[in-house]
Structure formats: C-alpha cells, structure tokens
From Swiss-Prot:
Keyword Iron: yes
Family that this chain belongs to: Belongs to the bacterial ring-hydroxylating dioxygenase ferredoxin component family.
Protein name listed in UniProt: Naphthalene 1,2-dioxygenase system, ferredoxin component
Pathway the protein contributes to: Aromatic compound metabolism; naphthalene degradation
One BP annotation, GO: catabolic process
InterPro entries: Rieske_2Fe-2S (IPR017941), Rieske_2Fe-2S_sf (IPR036922)
Pfam entry (one): Rieske
Classification of source organism: Bacteria, Pseudomonadati, Pseudomonadota, Gammaproteobacteria, Pseudomonadales
Needed cofactors: [2Fe-2S] cluster
Residues annotated as binding [2Fe-2S] cluster: C28, H30, C47, H50
Gene name tied to this protein: ndoA
Domain Rieske: residue ranges: 1-84
Keywords, in A-Z order: 2Fe-2S, Aromatic hydrocarbons catabolism, Electron transport, Iron, Iron-sulfur, Metal-binding, Plasmid, Transport
Length: 87
C-alpha cells in the first residue's frame, strides 16, 4: 500500500512493505509525478508518469528514465503512531 501525506509542509509517500513502513519524498526525481499515485510491487514503486522505478527502502533509482535517487526518511512506530525523521 502507498499513502501520500504532508508532514510539516513536506509531501511524502509512505509505503508498507512486508509489515514495515518506509517514507520517501512524494515527488519523482524525474518529473512532476506523485509517487503516492504510483504502483507498488514488493519494495519497488513505479512512477505513474514515465514508469521509472525506485527501491522504497533505499531510495535507489532502478531503471530509466529515472537516474537520480529519491530521498528516504527514517520511520519508526511509537504508540501506534508513525514517526518520521525529516532531517
């Protein structure tokens, strides 16, 4: 599952992969597409605009046309709340 959220004015995409939560910027590094509108398969998110893919756990760009990695953020669950480190 993928969910778009805004935290302290920053648009993020949250992903559930094998029971773990991961977070990246919500904007693709290649074009103005929201990753939260993309297709998640395993740990790979496909950009809905040009079908480039990223590893949501590491942010690594996996295939053309994306070449720049996407920023990831540390996530932890505390008292059933998702806590995201924006630094």
């Amino acid at each position: 599952d993928v969910l778009g959220v805004t935290v302290e004015g920053k648009d993020l995409a949250l992903y559930e992969v094998e029971g773990e939560i991961y977070a990246t910027d919500d904007l693709c590094t290649h074009g103005a597409a929201r990753m939260s509108d993309g297709y998640l398969e395993g740990r790979e998110i496909e950009c809905p605009l040009h079908q480039g893919r990223f590893d949501v756990c590491t942010g690594r760009a996996l295939c053309a046309p994306v070449t720049e990695n996407i920023k990831t953020y540390a996530v932890k669950i505390e008292n059933l709340r998702v806590m995201i480190d924006l630094s």
